[in-house]
Structure formats: C-alpha cells, structure tokens
C-alpha cells in the first residue's frame, strides 16, 4: 500500500473554488489528525484557465495530473464562456479531454437519501420511508457517444438525416462488469444490469458478457432490467437496488434520475476511474454561476467526493467511512445549507465546512 500520495486539485469555475476550500479543511485534518502523507498541488482548469492561460486544459495542468495519484476536481463553465464555440467551452474542452487522456472508463455516482432529508425527495413519503443507497456505475468511454460513423447528411432530394452508431467491444463491457461486481461485494451484494437486449445487438452482447462475468462472483446476485422498466422501477421502489450497471447512454439517463430523487444534487459526489484505479473525483452538480461568490453553496458533494478519493484512490475505507459519518452527524444535528433548508436559518458554505471538520476531529 502506498504511504505517500500526490493529489492534483483543480477548483475550476463558479462555486468550485468555494466548495474546494471546504475540502481543503478535511485534507488538513487527514494530514494532521490521521497522519496521512500526501502532497497537494493546485492547477487552473476550465474558464479561469482560458482567461489566464489561453486553454481550458493547459499543458501544465495535464502534466500535474499525470504526476499525481488522483485528481480532486471542482466544476467548470459559466455564462462568460457560453458564447465560445461548443468544442472550446470549458465543459467540453477540459473535462472530456481529461477523461479521454486518462481512459476514465467507469463513472461512479452514489445516490443516497438521508433520513433527515427525506422531505426533499420528489417521491412520496411511503416510497422513501426506508431510504435508499444506490451506486450507479456508468460505462464512460464507449457506446453511442463515441461510436463511428456519426454525422449529418443531405440527400439529393434535399432531405436531411442524422445518424449515430452504438458500438461496444467485449473488453469494454468485461472491465466495467468486473468493477461493478467487485464494488457490490463491499455493499449489499446485488448488481442490476441495465440494457435493451430485446432490440439492440449491442445490448445483447452487453447482457451475455455481464452474465459470463457474474460467474466469477457467486456471492453477488445479478438481475437484468430493460432501460424503460428500470426507469419506472427506480421511481416505484428505489430501495430494491444496490449497484446499477449501465452502458454509457443509459447510465447518463439513470444517474441523473437517481440524483434528482434524492432531493439535492448538492449532496452528490462522483468518481471516474481507469483500470489502474486512477481517478477524477468531482461533485455531480455544475458550477452554479448564479450563486458563485455568495458563500451559500453546499460543500457536502465536494467533501464526499474527497471521501470517494480516500476510499477508491487511497484504498482507505475506514477513513472514508469517518468522513461520511461526519457528514451524517451534522445532518442529524440539523445543520443545513440553503439548498437543503426549509427556512432561512441555514449555514454559509464555510460554516458547513467548519462543522463537518469539527465532527471529523471529534469522531462524531
């Protein structure tokens, strides 16, 4: 096990720098109180990088990430850069190249409802009464978003058409399936694979390989759902699911659905991993430029993203559990930021960071 870690910190735009400051408080505690040894180096990314260095992903930033064991990412984008050509906007010109460069093929999106925040869910109270804790695993580098040929054409009779190609290679499905089963072993030992194998050849291959991989994990129960049924079942009874294994397009849809039924995207972290478990860890929400600089953003998603880095990037489950426990502790005590408060008595961004940090120090 590594004893020295290097973390590249990329705060980015909008609320990114604000919530990242609260993650720094947790990093300081990990170093001083838990005696973890790591080096932290901060780099520009996104719109601020365009403004200061001319590129959304400067070479210096990419090189710094290459020398690191993990990337802790904030958020990118904002109205200032919305009139740029789409390929040059921070969201496209920073995050997608990072995913491609490091071959981050697996996106992990936890969707958990806390008992203290059940009232925020758009689902009926009897559905969320028992809570839910779903881990959506989305294949991130294959499928219809990357398949070729893809384009638009104009026929001689002036009829325009567009086309995309859904392609999956066996090795792409194999590696994401193994990861899903391995993660399920540390949870509730259930994997539900999402496909459309009654129509799509790519889904038939997906289902066949997932079934084959499942034989290596006899302690994990495997089920299959068509994407249309899965979307309905998540609304009807989310508590029946543990790990959802999804192709790229279906995972894009499912992970957002799982996020919205929790009631606040400001609570949700994510991780994108490659085969060596190198990862990029970031909040599931965006840069929220409308509230940037107001000190009202919820830092919990950024702190929980750091927890995922500790869990998967450092393989320190016990310490990650303590970070998660500190977040739960402050919620149980009634501390809220504006987005999860039902009144005007809420904490500022820095105040929420402080109470979580104090809970981590005290072991609450």
From Swiss-Prot:
Reaction(s) this enzyme catalyzes, per UniProt: (2R,3S)-3-isopropylmalate + NAD(+) = 4-methyl-2-oxopentanoate + CO2 + NADH
Record note on cofactor: Binds 1 Mg(2+) or Mn(2+) ion per subunit.
Gene3D superfamilies to which the protein is assigned, alphabetical: Isopropylmalate Dehydrogenase
Purpose of the protein: Catalyzes the oxidation of 3-carboxy-2-hydroxy-4-methylpentanoate (3-isopropylmalate) to 3-carboxy-4-methyl-2-oxopentanoate. The product decarboxylates to 4-methyl-2 oxopentanoate.
E.C. number(s) listed in UniProt: 1.1.1.85
Gene Ontology BP, a term: L-leucine biosynthetic process
List of residues binding NAD(+): 78-91, 286-298
GO molecular function, one term: NAD binding
Binding-site residues, substrate: 99, 109, 138, 228
Family (UniProt): Belongs to the isocitrate and isopropylmalate dehydrogenases family. LeuB type 1 subfamily.
Keyword Chloroplast annotated: no
NCBIfam families membership: leuB
Residues that coordinate or bind Mg(2+): 228, 252, 256
Site feature (Important for catalysis) residues: 145, 196
EC main group: oxidoreductase
Pathway, per record: Amino-acid biosynthesis; L-leucine biosynthesis; L-leucine from 3-methyl-2-oxobutanoate: step 3/4
InterPro entries: IsoCit/isopropylmalate_DH_CS (IPR019818), IsoPropMal-DH-like_dom (IPR024084), Isopropylmalate_DH (IPR004429)
Primary residence: cytoplasm
Cofactor(s) it depends on: Mg(2+); Mn(2+)
Subunit structure: Homodimer.
This protein's name: 3-isopropylmalate dehydrogenase
One cellular component term from this protein's GO annotations in UniProt: cytosol
Keywords, alphabetical: Amino-acid biosynthesis, Branched-chain amino acid biosynthesis, Cytoplasm, Leucine biosynthesis, Magnesium, Manganese, Metal-binding, NAD, Oxidoreductase, Plasmid
Subcellular location: Cytoplasm
